Amino acid sequence: MLLSGRNNRHPSSLVYNVHLFKLPVLQKSKLASIITISCIFYQNFVVDFPEPKPAMPDNSVQHRIAEKPWQKIDEGLETAEFNSPQKSFIGDSRITVIRINPDRYAFKLIAASENNKQHKTAPEWYKDKKLLACVNAGQFNLDDQLSNMGYMKNYSHVNNPNFRKINNYNSILAFNRKDTSVAPIQIIDLKCQDWAQLQTKYHSFTQSISLITCNKQIVDNKQKGKWSMVLFGMDEKGNVLWIFTRSPYTIRQFSEILLSLPLAIQQVMYLEGGPETSLYLETNGKKIAKMGSYETGFWESDANQQYWPLPNVIGIVKK
């Protein structure tokens, strides 16, 4: 997650033995006391080494894994992997992208708040809702463990009625359109688009942090923390891009990296970061299973190998 409220939470390898992230709902408030005790040992016995400096960007075509990186999964569904031109200090610095044609695939907003308040991992949501793929729907509130940090509505169900007006929460993903006068899915930029008019055109919305604006400009985000991340993007042709990195970067770093890749990016918004970061696809003989790990100030390790339970996901099905 990318939340100031988590800055006082510390990682420790001792926490891994608790196995709390296997529970149906990760009770982070209860985890705080365990982490506090663990950090006493962490601070006393672990030496902090200086973070290695990342390598300088490589602007040549060598940052691509292939000159034609896209692999077809099905009609209107493709995937690609890229070597980041800026190397992270942890992991393989690989970026996974799933490209989805919204003319062929419908998007579903799935919230625990309208599904018996049951949290599920991404693979569990995938199976339960008969999806082809799914991803985080945004950061969730750590207090109630259900509501999105920003506005979220799905048809008549309101997960969070409140607009978040801080921390660059200027992007609202809108889909399940009411008529064909608008695109089937879009990221509404509150800084340059008419929200009052567009909110009448769709059934499903989720609000989050803007990374790249409607004018292809990087938002000036000064946060110095680094995270594994999954993002929601749109390209110049109106395709959806699900973008994942397990290797951690700052928000600004990663935005710059994305604009350097051959993705034809139009807009990008943040979905989730750290160990909650989830991306899962299984269809037509192809499986992509990605989970995040590193998060500054909370989970400063690349050791996470399990999906964490989530209250809200976005999934796709064929039209």
List the predicted regions and their residue ranges:
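Active-site beta-strand/loop microenvironment that shapes enzyme catalytic pockets
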Residues: 129, 158-317
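N-terminal Lys/Arg-rich, disordered targeting/topogenic segments
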Residues: 2-23
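Polar/charged alpha-helical tracts
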Residues: 16, 124, 197-200
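Polar low-complexity intrinsically disordered regions enriched in Ser/Thr and small residues
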Residues: 8-9, 79, 153, 236, ...
